[in-house]
Amino acid sequence: GFKANLKGHYYKDNFHEFEVSSLKIWNRSIPVSGGGYLRIFPWIMMKHLLKRYLKDNDFYVLYIHPFELSERECPQLPSSTSASTRQRFNYGRASVPKKLAKLINLLESNGFKFSTFRDLLVERDSL
């Protein structure tokens, strides 16, 4: 089995997994870590979810897909990709840089500091 020594971090041997930040709403786990949810949700909704999450948690995992920050068109998707998936990958991309800046500002105003997973593991090993 996996061991846990930091909240949201699980490991076995040299394999490490960091849990994405999420909220339980109506018995469902809703990710609030960024990525597609940051792109698709309106900022007012994302801000509300983030504030709820930050109230009860002292860590936050942020992730962004590189294509979400690119001004270039999404790379060619396989021809078997459904129209709804194609739409989902493109929807809201123009809003991501502004939302990301707001998200970072919200985290900093709540006392959060930024780090990498590697630095967290080095810090853990030095304890």
Question: Locations of the language-model features?
Answer:
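C-terminal domain-boundary segment and adjacent tail
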Residues: 40-127
